[in-house]
């Protein structure tokens, strides 16, 4: 078999794969659209829980501070992933990798110190209001009432 025939066979196999995957997606979406129930009632957005009628509303408003905590979790989770990858390859990285990891940790710690200084981690509104009135970090008075 020549090289051209092998390449053509690979392209055909890939084309058949793409067409079958696309066809399966179209089939599933069309089947769901045609066979699915259409409810225009008010209870369409109500979750179904074992046949029990819901009491109250399921729409809760969360404070933005919960999203802040979630973002901190994501940031420090990604930091942990980078440090784990560095720790598994510490012998290959050597001192250069150690210095780079130290710089990475120091940058993240500087960001954390900055967030603590501006009051981004405070859950009480009094300190946040006081810091907003005070101005930038360098101009914050020590004793303010």
Swiss-Prot record:
InterPro entries assigned: NAD(P)H_OxRDtase_bac/plastid, NADH_UbQ/plastoQ_OxRdtase_su3, NDAH_ubi_oxred_su3_sf
EC number: 7.1.1.-
Example GO molecular function: quinone binding
Subcellular localization(s) per the UniProt record: Cell inner membrane
Top EC class for this record: translocase
Name of the molecule in the record: NADH-quinone oxidoreductase subunit A
Topological relation to the membrane, as annotated: Multi-pass membrane protein
């Amino acid at each position: 078999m020549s090289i051209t025939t092998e390449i053509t066979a690979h392209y055909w196999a890939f084309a058949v794969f793409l067409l079958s995957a696309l066809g399966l997606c179209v089939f599933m979406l069309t089947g769901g659209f045609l066979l699915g129930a259409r409810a225009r009632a008010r209870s369409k957005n109500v979750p179904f829980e074992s046949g029990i009628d819901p009491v109250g509303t399921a729409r809760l408003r969360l404070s933005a501070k919960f999203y802040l905590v979630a973002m901190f979790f994501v940031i420090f989770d990604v930091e942990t992933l980078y440090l784990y990858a560095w720790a598994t390859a510490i012998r290959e990285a050597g001192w250069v990798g150690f210095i780079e990891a130290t710089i990475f940790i120091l940058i993240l710690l500087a960001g954390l110190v900055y967030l603590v200084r501006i009051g981004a981690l405070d859950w009480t509104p009094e300190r946040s209001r006081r810091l907003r009135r005070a101005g930038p970090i360098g101009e914050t008075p020590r004793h303010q009432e």
